[in-house]
Amino acid sequence: HGHSLLSNTKNEWRNLRGTRISMIFQDCGGTLNPIRKIGSQYVEYICTHTDVSKAEAWKKGCSMLQKMRLPDAENIMKSYPHQLSGGMRQRVGIAMAMTFNPELLLADEPTSALDVTTQAQIVRQMMELRDDFGTGIIIVTHNIGVAAYMADQLVVMQNGKVVDQGTRDEVMNHPTSDYTKKLLAAVPEMEGQRYV
């Protein structure tokens, strides 16, 4: 079904990145050019990877922003990054990452810079996109609640080494390493239940 990426040429990697494999960064706002409007950047991104007109790319960008439940996608496309909230910029980044229905999405702390309410919305939207497009997601997070909610499989790392791995239920309910046990014990309790 798959093939090794280890022997890919630079050109093969270029064709994969942004289309079949995509990335959401911790601060998507930092990856956006501050002196270019969102629409200009989004249209360029789409046109770089496809043979569509700028008008078609604009429509596709608006459609993806609407899927991320951003109000008034046309207005967002006409905005500069600094005119959007952190949550809105993060949604723009996720929309861009999902534009080509990637097979694999890498998400590096995609919610850590956001308030709790926005975090929950972003996580739900990522899972909806996963379900809609059949995208596999590898998420790097320090948030045990996000990991417990999103993951089918968990890998716990300490100092760059794997110390626990398995299904979500195996790792959450039967951790094997002391490190994982300490992480889980540090999760706050509410009415006698761990808050994950």
Set out the residue ranges of the language-model regions:
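ABC ATPase NBD coupling module
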Residues: 4-22, 40, 48, 170-175
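Conserved ABC ATPase "signature" region
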Residues: 56-75, 184-185
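Helical segment within the ABC ATPase nucleotide-binding domain
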Residues: 120-133, 145
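ABC ATPase "signature
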Residues: 165-166
